C-alpha cells in the first residue's frame, strides 16, 4: 500500500494543508494535483486589485514551482482527477502526458467551490462572467482594459449581479478605480445575509457616495451584444449599457468528484470533526467541505464556512491528524473582514 499523501486542489486549503503537514512530517511523499498552474495567491486579493492598479501576474505571491520546492511536494499541475477508487485507494488523473493512476495512503479533497450560474436570456448570455480564480480575474481585467483603450468610448461601466460579500467588494474596488458600477439584487439591501439593517444602510450609503448605483428587488432578464458593448435588460424593462457583466450571486461547493466516488454529500462534502469524509482515508476541507464542527439549524451535517480563517484552522487540525496525532477541529469565533474601504467592516462568522 502506498504511503503517499495526495492533496487535490491548489487553493488556500490545499497549499496550507501541505505547509502545515510539512511542519510535522518531513518525509512522507506528498503529491498536489491541480487543474490550474498551482501558483499561490490570496484569493481575497481578487476583489481589491483594481483600485490598487495591480495586474493579474502581480497577484501571485509565490510561483507553484517555488511552493513545491519549499515544501518538498510533487506538483502535478494542469492535471485533472477523473475518478477515485475508494476501495483500492487510487485515483486516475489525466494531463497532457495522458492518463495515470496514483495510489494514496491518505487523500485530501480541497476542490473549492464553483460560481453559481444564474440563467439569463440574450445573445450575450455567455458573456456574463464570474471571478472565482486568478484566471477568471485575468479575463475580466483584459475585458475592462480593452474597453478603456477604445477611442471615444464613454466611462467604463460594469453591472454586478448580486449585492452580497463579493458583489459589494467588487463594487467598491471598481468604483475606486474609476469604473461606473451598477449593482442589481433581488433582495432589499446589501450584505443582507451578514449585516443587520442599520449596517446595511450605512454600507449602501458609503458605496453610493463612490458612485455605485443599486437596483434592489430587481433581476437581470437578458444580456445582448450592442454596438461593441453589452446591453443588459433588467426585469423592470430598463436597458443598461455595460462593458462587462459580473455575476456575484454566490458559490456552490464543488462536489462532483466526491459524488462520483460515492462519498456522502449534502450542501458540500460531509466531514466529521476530524475532517474525514464517509470513506476511510479520505478527508476534505475548505469551500468544498461541510463541517460537523460547525453545527447548523439547517442541516444535521453542519455548515459550510467559505472564509479564510476556518480554512487555516481546519488545515492545522487536519495536518496533525494526517501526521499521526488525531485532532478534532474546534472552531472559535472567527471574524470575517469585508473589504469595502468605503466602510470597513468586520463580521462575526
Model-flagged regions — what are they?
Residues 2-73, 172-194:
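Beta1-alpha1 glycine-rich phosphate/pyrophosphate-binding loop at the start
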Residues 8, 102-112, 240-250, 315:
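Short hydrophobic core segments
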Residues 60, 155-159, 165-222, 310, ...:
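Rossmann-like dinucleotide-binding cores of NAD(P)H-dependent redox enzymes
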Residues 70-85, 208-220:
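A conserved beta-strand/loop element that lines the FAD pocket in flavoprotein oxidoreductases
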Residues 85-101, 224-239:
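Conserved beta-strand-loop-beta-strand element in the redox core of flavoprotein oxidoreductases
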Residues 111-177:
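Glycine-rich dinucleotide-binding loop and its adjacent helix/turn
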Residues 126-148, 233, 238-313:
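FAD-site-proximal beta/loop scaffold in flavoenzymes
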Amino acid at each position: 500500500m502506498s504511503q503517499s499523501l495526495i492533496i487535490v486542489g491548489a487553493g488556500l486549503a490545499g497549499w496550507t494543508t501541505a505547509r502545515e503537514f510539512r511542519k510535522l512530517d518531513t518525509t512522507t511523499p506528498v503529491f498536489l494535483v491541480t487543474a490550474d498552474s498551482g501558483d499561490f495567491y490570496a484569493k481575497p486579493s481578487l476583489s481589491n486589485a483594481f483600485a490598487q492598479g495591480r495586474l493579474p501576474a502581480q497577484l501571485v505571491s509565490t510561483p507553484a514551482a517555488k511552493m513545491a520546492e519549499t515544501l518538498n511536494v510533487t506538483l502535478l499541475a494542469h492535471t485533472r482527477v477523473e475518478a477515485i477508487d475508494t476501495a483500492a485507494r487510487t485515483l486516475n488523473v489525466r494531463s497532457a502526458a495522458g492518463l495515470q493512476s496514483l495510489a494514496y495512503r491518505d487523500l485530501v479533497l480541497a476542490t473549492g467551490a464553483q460560481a453559481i450560474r444564474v440563467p439569463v436570456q440574450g445573445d450575450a448570455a455567455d458573456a456574463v462572467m464570474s471571478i472565482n480564480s486568478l484566471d477568471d480575474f485575468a479575463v475580466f481585467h483584459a475585458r475592462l482594459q480593452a474597453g478603456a483603450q477604445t477611442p471615444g468610448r464613454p466611462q467604463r461601466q460594469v453591472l454586478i449581479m448580486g449585492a452580497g460579500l463579493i458583489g459589494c467588494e467588487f463594487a467598491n474596488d471598481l468604483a475606486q478605480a474609476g469604473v461606473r458600477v451598477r449593482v442589481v439584487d433581488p433582495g432589499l439591501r446589501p450584505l443582507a445575509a451578514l449585516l443587520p439593517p442599520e449596517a446595511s444602510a450605512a454600507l449602501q450609503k458609503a458605496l453610493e457616495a463612490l458612485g455605485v448605483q443599486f437596483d434592489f428587488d430587481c433581476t437581470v432578464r437578458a444580456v445582448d451584444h450592442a454596438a461593441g458593448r453589452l446591453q443588459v435588460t433588467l426585469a423592470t424593462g430598463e436597458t443598461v449599457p455595460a462593458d462587462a457583466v459580473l455575476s456575484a450571486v454566490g458559490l456552490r461547493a464543488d462536489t462532483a468528484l466526491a459524488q462520483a466516488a460515492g462519498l456522502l454529500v449534502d450542501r458540500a462534502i460531509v466531514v466529521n470533526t476530524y475532517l474525514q469524509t464517509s470513506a476511510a482515508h479520505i478527508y476534505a476541507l475548505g469551500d468544498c467541505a461541510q463541517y460537523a464542527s460547525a453545527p447548523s439549524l439547517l442541516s444535521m451535517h453542519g455548515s459550510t464556512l467559505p472564509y479564510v480563517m476556518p480554512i487555516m484552522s481546519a488545515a492545522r487540525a487536519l495536518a496533525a491528524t494526517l501526521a499521526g496525532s488525531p485532532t478534532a477541529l474546534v472552531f472559535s469565533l472567527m471574524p470575517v473582514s469585508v473589504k469595502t474601504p468605503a466602510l470597513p467592516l468586520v463580521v462575526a462568522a
